[in-house]
Swiss-Prot record:
It is found in: Cytoplasm. Gene3D superfamilies: HUPs (3.40.50.620). The keyword Transit peptide does not apply. It catalyses: beta-nicotinamide D-ribonucleotide + ATP + H(+) = diphosphate + NAD(+). GO terms for biological process: NAD biosynthetic process. Keywords: ATP-binding, Cytoplasm, NAD, Nucleotide-binding, Nucleotidyltransferase, Pyridine nucleotide biosynthesis, Transferase. Belongs to the archaeal NMN adenylyltransferase family. InterPro entries: Cyt_trans-like, NMN_Atrans_arc, Rossmann-like_a/b/a_fold. Pathway: Cofactor biosynthesis; NAD(+) biosynthesis; NAD(+) from nicotinamide D-ribonucleotide: step 1/1. This is Nicotinamide-nucleotide adenylyltransferase. SUPFAM superfamilies: Nucleotidylyl transferase. Pfam families: CTP_transf_like. It comes from Methanococcus aeolicus (strain ATCC BAA-1280 / DSM 17508 / OCM 812 / Nankai-3).
Length: 172
């Protein structure tokens, strides 16, 4: 059985990792959709699809389960969105999502939708992690080492801080 899970993964964090590991115990393969793949360089979506793909692959490399990582752009047309996702991904049998609209759309097309267990939502949240980066608070313990490596490689900390500025300044 093959499962689909779609997220923005901005960034991929330990809560996401726990969900993926849990799903891997229930299915044979996982399709990890990079939602809003066209978005980057904004405070809500600071990382490119390619950077998010690197984060996920580097975070999952030590685990032994098959998965695919597929970028999925927004199309702003809910009535055909499931067909659009189906055209971009390998076939799948089940969808994991906590999003009510995603659940509604996939169930209308006959898919079983399961709600993944959420882990420590207060800390394991992309919004919280980005906020901590901006405020120079501890955040690295909330994400896998592979994600830390990617953020370091692309100077992602400073990118997020620059995106938070109203005017351009030099970050020391």
């Amino acid at each position: 059985m093959r499962a689909l899970i779609i997220g923005r993964w901005q960034p991929f964090h330990n809560g996401h990792l726990s969900i993926i590991k849990e799903i891997s115990n229930e299915v044979d393969e996982i399709i990890i959709g990079i939602g809003s793949a066209q978005k980057s360089h904004s405070l809500d979506n600071p990382f490119t699809a390619g950077e998010r793909i690197m984060m996920i692959i580097k975070s999952l490399k030590k685990y032994n389960f098959p998965y695919y990582v597929i970028p999925i752009k927004d199309i702003e047309f809910n009535a055909v969105w499931v067909s659009y996702v189906e055209a971009l991904t390998p076939p799948f049998d089940i969808v994991y999502s906590g999003n009510a609209l995603v659940k509604e759309l996939f169930e209308e097309k006959g898919y079983e939708v399961r709600k993944p267990k959420l882990y420590n939502r207060t800390e394991y949240s992309g919004t919280e992690i980005r906020k901590r980066i901006i405020n120079n608070e501890d955040w690295k313990h909330l994400i896998p080492n592979g994600v830390i490596n990617v953020i370091d490689e692309i100077d992602g900390e400073n990118r997020i801080k620059r995106l938070n500025m109203k005017d351009y300044d030099i970050i020391e």
